[in-house]
Amino acid sequence: MRVAPMTSRFLDACRRRPTDVRPVWFMRQAGRYMKQYRQIREKHGILEICKRPDLAATVTLQPIEVLDVDAAIIFADLLLPIEPMGLKLKYEKGEGPVIGNPVRTSDDVDSLSTTNTDELGYVGEAIQHVVRALAGKVPVVGFVGAPFTMASYMIEGGASRNFVRTKKLMYSDETLWRRLMGKIVDVLAPFAHSQVAAGARAIQVFDSWVGALGSDDYVRFAAPYSRALIERIRSTGVPVIHFGTGASGFFRELHAAGGDVMGVDWRINIDQAWMDISYRSAIQGNLDPVALFAPLPELRTKVQELLKRTGTRPGHIFNLGHGILPETPVENVKAVVELVREFRP
């Protein structure tokens, strides 16, 4: 399946083509910092919003209306694919995601299903709602987790600080690890394809926990599966954004796993990151999310410095180095969009 190309400022930048101004959008641009989102969350839980296409579409569209950004990332949850695999997912207040039956043994891996991804059809329905509402104004971005991050959640049973269980399995039974990672890819790839079929015109692969690894372990245990996933997504013809948190120490290795666009967190200067990969992909990022709390003069300076670092080379998409934080002043987010649009190198 290959989709017909769509023209937009954001997609042009993904392909390293010249744009009139720098495209801008934000990870977690739909979230608690917005009053409109908080009003919906007062009545509905995270998973309920994700599984109701009407609500997911409404939340996805809110930042387009409020911020006038250049892309609409679908509102969903990274861990949704683990449910059709047979795992029990819930959200505990103050704890984040909790998996009731984590994967710890060979039997656990054997029991994981890879054939029920049609149960995630509600995400595609939400994308279709958003595509209709936008009527070509901006493209929709779909997303999946990277295999290492998904495996970490599945093994740990939720978020982790040191990833002891994950690394213990990885080091002690490499065969089992590779079976698990292969199954994860076999679920994530068709899920990404279904998002493209529904109308997504780019897919972001989030490797939220990859910073737990060193360079050698990344290359050995994670990169082959990220590469396999990205190659399968790219077969649809849409650009893939590859974003890893805390990966500045092995950014070249991350890039070697693939991606039309490489997302950068705030821990490395974006010009250095781009140079490190010889400008062979577009680059996305990388304002520190906490900079959005700065007074406007300081925020203006930071935004302009970042934009100057990427110069006039086509292929920079302005974003944060991670998601927007819940307490962020919405007026500051709006100000960043205006500053990016006004910037002239």
UniProtKB/Swiss-Prot annotation:
InterPro entries: UROD/MetE-like_sf, Uroporphyrinogen_deCO2ase_HemE, Uroporphyrinogen_deCOase. Pathway: Porphyrin-containing compound metabolism; protoporphyrin-IX biosynthesis; coproporphyrinogen-III from 5-aminolevulinate: step 4/4. Homodimer. GO terms for molecular function: uroporphyrinogen decarboxylase activity. It is found in: Cytoplasm. Its EC number is 4.1.1.37. Belongs to the uroporphyrinogen decarboxylase family. It comes from Solibacter usitatus (strain Ellin6076). Substrate binds at residues 28-32, 77, 153, 208, 322. It catalyses: uroporphyrinogen III + 4 H(+) = coproporphyrinogen III + 4 CO2. PROSITE patterns: UROD_1. Transmembrane segments: none annotated. The gene is hemE. The record marks 77 as: Transition state stabilizer. This is Uroporphyrinogen decarboxylase. One of its GO terms (cellular component) is cytosol. Keywords: Cytoplasm, Decarboxylase, Lyase, Porphyrin biosynthesis. The keyword Lyase applies. NCBIfam families: hemE (TIGR01464). Catalyzes the decarboxylation of four acetate groups of uroporphyrinogen-III to yield coproporphyrinogen-III. HAMAP family: URO_D.
